[in-house]
């Protein structure tokens, strides 16, 4: 995150500044150094659909297709 010194006992950076503004900008909060969860979920969902489609394709072609 940032090099700010925290006054909280567990070392967290406060969520809001005293005037009510967010302590960390929204854009950097969601895109700083990590993959967004929606991107991971989309890739995982596409992989699941691909594998299930492969099983359905295999049931009509090759062994087990009658």
UniProtKB/Swiss-Prot annotation:
Keywords for this protein: Membrane, Photosynthesis, Photosystem II, Reaction center, Thylakoid, Transmembrane, Transmembrane helix
Disulfide bonds listed in the record: none
Record SUPFAM superfamilies: Photosystem II reaction center protein J, PsbJ
Annotated TM spans: 37-57
A Pfam cross-reference name: PsbJ
Compartments in which it is found: Cellular thylakoid membrane
Source domain of life: Bacteria
One GO biological process term: photosynthesis
Topology in membrane: Single-pass membrane protein
GO cellular component: photosystem II reaction center; plasma membrane-derived thylakoid membrane
Family: Belongs to the PsbJ family.
HAMAP family: PSII_PsbJ
Subunit structure: PSII is composed of 1 copy each of membrane proteins PsbA, PsbB, PsbC, PsbD, PsbE, PsbF, PsbH, PsbI, PsbJ, PsbK, PsbL, PsbM, PsbT, PsbX, PsbY, PsbZ, Psb30/Ycf12, peripheral proteins PsbO, CyanoQ (PsbQ), PsbU, PsbV and a large number of cofactors. It forms dimeric complexes.
Function comment: One of the components of the core complex of photosystem II (PSII). PSII is a light-driven water:plastoquinone oxidoreductase that uses light energy to abstract electrons from H(2)O, generating O(2) and a proton gradient subsequently used for ATP formation. It consists of a core antenna complex that captures photons, and an electron transfer chain that converts photonic excitation into a charge separation.
Name under which the protein is recorded: Photosystem II reaction center protein J
Organism: Synechococcus sp. (strain CC9311)
């Amino acid at each position: 995150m940032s090099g700010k010194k925290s006054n909280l006992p567990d070392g967290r950076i406060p969520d809001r500044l005293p005037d009510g503004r967010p302590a960390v900008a929204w854009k950097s909060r969601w895109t700083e150094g990590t993959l967004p969860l929606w991107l991971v979920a989309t890739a995982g969902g596409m992989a699941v659909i691909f594998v299930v489609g492969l099983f359905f394709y295999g049931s009509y072609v090759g062994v087990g297709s009658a």
